[in-house]
């Protein structure tokens, strides 16, 4: 059993949008909810007998959250050091096993598939760590008892479980390219077709995966060993793994079994519901309440339907709300209300934006959420007009937050320089056989690695890998994407900078801002290509390729560093984690490209801008495409009124950060709206996602307030299963579309607007 306290409570981090378990390509904001690691730090040595009428699993959970530690068990206060060795567990002689890598990578496939589906819909992606940890335990633990060792049997402990979850994360976190920059390349006519470009897609994924992976090793040294950053979600994963393997009491075993059962049932239920609902979407999936009221005689209410206000019974975003909390969900909702309930209608009323009539027979039924427009400057659609304020305010908000962390980054740079100089001088003295008496830099002792030397990643392994991946990036960029070597080097430098920012932010607040600040790379690359005077299409391709390299490589480095934190706490071998990350990333490259080709085959609109995409909103794609056009065009293709609004909201967002940090006490930060969430509401036209999220957030809040012990067991497992299940349901739906047995062929239009199929 584990017990601990993390320096980030639900209230303290709730103001961030969903990342570690859930992240957004556009908001870059992660998951704030880490339910199983926040508890009292008092240590008690008392016996706590179970009431015969009480659920043993809840009693176990209550002992975790109340501070009571049953006799003979370990109490842990998380100070960044590895958990103490549990004398009740056997020694793990083998951590890097084929079963851990294969099972972990397959679980990463599930999350990767979910990320492709959900990312194309909203720009959201989800981390695979906790999902891989729990499901990996559920699969391997029973097999370890019944199979011979040669076939995957043998003891399965927490260290190997850490290897499973890092393989899952490595394999499942490479889909960001395919829900943002890559579709944007096709929309701009810069690529041919996914099947024809499959080699280029593979190499682009490879260079973004391995550069970030190798760079995570030195980041571990500084941020995990020396700074001892909290990393809330990876720490939650470590505590979860330890609790799953706690077999000292019947209550602990029952609690672990309940989490597994909840996760499995919610996953299967969500997958089934998503797949079946496409055959009657107007009844089972989308409730177009305002359309129903219109057909019953309330003619004026058709305008609400035109602006996309209806309810979708989406398990994934109900689960996302459970994980994100009230602040993140309501900030998203506030942005949607402002954009699609206030500003948008005012724009249309004043003739600043224009929609497309849906039907001549139904006056007032107009599509306002489409990106299509014949003249983006003089006759923009509301969605195009609102895109720029949304993107700009998120960028301003994120950089304002980073600015307040500038002293920390400067301290990190100085400390890294001092430590490196000390190491080089020490090595030089040893080579010459001289005595080295120079005093160690302040805090240098904290860099001592608790892992034995044979479990540490050799210097040659990550340095050689880093250099090879850098060379590969330049070679692939030049020969396959006509990328200038100077632009390629700049993209690698930006990835380096973004990785530092992302790990620092993720390690302290669980917020990874890379999705937003990657827009800065597009601005930098756009300036370089303009100065070079290269043709427009080459400039656009360079912008998207270099921007995706900087963003995806840095994002992967942040994910890998978080996994190394989980392994550090569990005393897992860093070199075993390292090779698992390489294997998982290698498998993930094939899976990510294959999944994108599958979806592009089923839904041609993903790569053809002329086809209206009713199944996917693609907000991240729209943002990357629009920014690319803007930074490479001779004049900015932004309506003047949209630009003014963007500047005003950007100033307001930055000012909020200043006021929050300088004058508002920390305990009140949870009441301050999250501007990343507000901006997301501008970028994502689907208002039913924040509606589902606030319902999920309120359910989780009420549950945790009234029955915290039950919530600790149920909330995350239920939410994770709902999210992954709908994502896999989306993959199954894509397969059904390809074989022509999907809902758009055999489904019913009952209760859909205009009596046309709405699935």
Task: Describe the residue ranges of each PLM region.
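Alpha-helical multipass membrane-protein architecture
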Residues: 2-7, 12, 18-759
